[in-house]
Amino acid sequence: MKGTPSFGKRNKNLHIRCRRCGKNSYHVRKKVCAACGFGRSRRIRRYSWQNKKITGQRLK
């Protein structure tokens, strides 16, 4: 058997499916979605660094 005794404790669902965004990111104990911010704010959590920037330059 591999791993330390602490690894045996890692068998519970920390995140469940979010009601608002549908991703598996709703933290059960915190009651906050890590993906969309549901439970923390009414606004959808969005950042500019989430998507890659398109420079418009082609490689030669």
Swiss-Prot record:
Origin superkingdom: Archaea
Cofactor info, note text: Binds 1 zinc ion per subunit.
InterPro entries named among the record's database cross-references: Ribosomal_eL37, Ribosomal_eL37/eL43, Ribosomal_eL37_CS, Ribosomal_zn-bd
GO terms, molecular function: rRNA binding; structural constituent of ribosome; zinc ion binding
Protein function: Binds to the 23S rRNA.
Family under the similarity heading: Belongs to the eukaryotic ribosomal protein eL37 family.
Name by which UniProt lists this protein: Large ribosomal subunit protein eL37
Sorted UniProt keywords: Metal-binding, Ribonucleoprotein, Ribosomal protein, RNA-binding, rRNA-binding, Zinc, Zinc-finger
